[in-house]
Amino acid sequence: MEPNLLEIPLWRAAVLALVPLLYAGGGAAATVLGQRRGAAAWRVARWSAALALGAALLSLGGLLAGGAALLRGPALVTLGDAGAVHLGLRSDALGGLMLVLISFIGWVIVGYSQPYLDGARGQPRYIRGLMLTLAAVSLLVVSNNLAVMALAWIASSLALHGLLTFFDDRPQALIAAHKKFLASRVADLCLLGGVALVGLQLGTLEIDRAIAAARALPATPGTLQAAALLLATSALLKCAQLPVHGWLIQVMEAPTPVSALLHAGVVNLGGFLLIRVGALVADVPAAQALLVVVGSTTAVVAALVTMTRISIKVSLAWSTCAQMGFMLMQCGLGLHELALLHLVAHSLYKGHAFLAAGGAVAQQRLRQMTPAAPPLSAATWGLGALVGIAVVAAAALAWGLKPAAEPALWAVGGILALALVPLLTGPLLRAGVLGALAGLAGATAVALAYFGLHALFSGWLGSASAGAASPALVAWVLVCFGLLFVVQGAVRVWPRGALARWLYPALFAGLYLDELFTRLTFRLWPARVPAMPGTLAKRPVPQPDMQAPS
């Protein structure tokens, strides 16, 4: 539900505008100071990030004290019947939470980057790209204008491209960045097309006014249905969903802090867009179906592929792909509050996971020192599922959630129940009855916290869970994740069985989807990359009148 927004006080508007300006100023300072004064450039970047975090927290405090509000701002460009491009700023729960999240991640990554890149060439270029990416993302989350949001999203993608190609002598990094560049440009066209259709149909690009105008219509016209499909497609492409997911897996050649920024604060912006303009997509069944089918399929496939990976960073990348699919599926089901909860939790976890990836070897050694758990049986796996379903159902009923009123929410709760099975079976196998009781207590706490946070985020967003999700989509989701649970259980119970041996080659290759997409991208727009060391491209080619050495 779109809240009634008041005019924002001037000081709150100034604090909101200060966040992207601080990041942009830090990027400009890095350009001016250059390589010779790299230490000074890093100091400016750290101070800019710290002040931006402080401004974001101050803005959140103003929001909690004064409520949601906005500043219309002046019209920069008039687009006739499609409205105008306003520098309008919006202070609400969604934008405030995202602004603090982005500023916190930015502050951590800036501090991590300096020692990580110590001695590397091109540090001013890195600082500039990092700060401009943060500036564009922070502008996106505080804007109340669809055109400004679209332009900020495009700017963040272009700035991030410079970070992904920071090591310009690594062919794999350049190939992955090239594939992302092409997918992002297609997504940009979809985004701009969707924004244009919204403006032409509703006569405004201001988000609050556009949503109010759309709700006033007796039925959703074809123009808005096409706009919803374009916006959903843009989000799917930007969030690296199948089959254009390969670049997300292969950008591991980029600096580690860039991977953390990408996975924690940029790739999930598609979810933010769908939450922000959710009312424009929620009444279009085709757009909902697109998000649910593609998102759930990506989540299931990526989760299975993750089981075959040994590399920590590659495993995390496949995990991000799956998590983004799950988030978009929630948006398609109308569960925007759960999608926001998922977005925030994933950002914090994945940012930490990438920055702490260097300690994975020590953690693995500690795990190897612990006694091995007894083998898992099919009966134990099935019993864990039944207990998980009972725990989640009890927690949902304790929060007053009725299955008939909110089937989509209960479907996601069923997925949570299946996800709790390792938490229930692991302690049982390792510590017997006491372990089982500890696992049961932990699962109960997780389920209660999940539905409690759902209620909290629902109140912040001013909306209730969507109970109008198509029964067919709810059934599709349950079948997909039920199949995932069965396959994962079979592989864990019989790791050398026929099913595991049959699935492993295809899953390890990612079902060969990225190979097809890579061929297509290079056929449409070949990339210029340096030859990999040790390849034939580096060796002299004998001429016809010369005899090659024997």
Residue map of PLM features:
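Transmembrane helix-loop-helix hairpins at membrane boundaries of multipass inner-membrane proteins
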Residues: 1-15, 25-128, 208-211
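Alpha-helical multi-pass transmembrane bundles of energy-transducing inner-membrane proteins
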Residues: 129-214, 324-366
